[in-house]
Amino acid sequence: MGENDLDYGYEPFADTPEYRAVNETIVQRWVNAMREAGSVHLDRIVDLATGVGTMVQLLIEKLPRAAKPKDVVCVDMSDRALEQAGANLAGSVDRVTPIHSPVQDLALEPESVDMAMWGNGVHYLTGEEQRRTFERIREALRPGGWFLFNSAFVAESRPAETLAFYRGQIATAVRSLRERGVKREKSTPAAESAMFLPLSHYRQMLEQTGFRVEEVREVVAQLYQSAWEKISGFSQYAAGALHGYPLDDAAEALVAAVKPALEQYGFVDEHGERYVPRHWYFAIARKELGALRSGE
């Protein structure tokens, strides 16, 4: 990847085969959980931090025909992304309702949606912002409604045997930045996504905000060089890994450091290709019905 190929957005990573495969697996499990519970009728759903609609598209593809939602509420801070999401979903649902808003400020009518999904974004908020968002989601869900989210930025996402890769990549990137005379602003705080909160935090947050936790599970993805270069070029990833450095310089240095770090610390698959595994975790929770509480 050359300098002119850098794209600081998330979509280049979301377009990789690895990303689609791991998220297809997660979405299929979400659909299966709803089917197993006898609850797959989704009239209206909300997709938080929708981007261009990749996750909700996967969901619609996996749902039985009779269960496909009529109205999808897409929430994002980017007007461009919302416009593209609407175009991508055209023909799949009767109506797409775009909302330009931070997810933590979302205000939907009480008990107006059957399901809320949040793909690969919960880790960008502070703990208090997460709490506020969970509370607003619960308020918007109808009784028995579903809350589904995932993340590859929890404490358990990077097993001990993979840490050498991250350290090697960052060391190489920092060395390159110093050689180029790029200064770090030490007073810049680390991004929330660099905090890597544990799974127990999210489980407790769900319970404290009134959800019934149905399932928390992991899916392991083997990420190869191109995928690592694309996520390393994502602005928020670069800001978390090399906080304090100018964003464009940090992203460029991280991308360039992928190949040497993989060569030194990567795992080798059956075809001789190098990769590093990343653990995605997903949660399935419900807004409880009174009958569910009394029957526990």
Where are the model-predicted features located?
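Conserved class I S-adenosyl-L-methionine
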Residues: 1-46, 54-58, 62, 148-176
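A short acidic, Gly/Pro-enriched loop at the edge of an enzyme's catalytic core
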Residues: 108-116
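Short alpha-helix
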Residues: 194-209
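Class I SAM-dependent methyltransferase SAM/SAH-binding core
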Residues: 44-46, 52-105
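A short glycine-rich, Lys/Arg-flanked "PGG" loop and its adjoining helix->strand segment in the class I
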Residues: 131-143
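A short beta-strand submotif of the Rossmann-like class I SAM-dependent methyltransferase core
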Residues: 118-121
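C-terminal helical/coil "lid" or tail adjacent to the Rossmann-like core of SAM-dependent
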Residues: 2-9, 13, 214-270
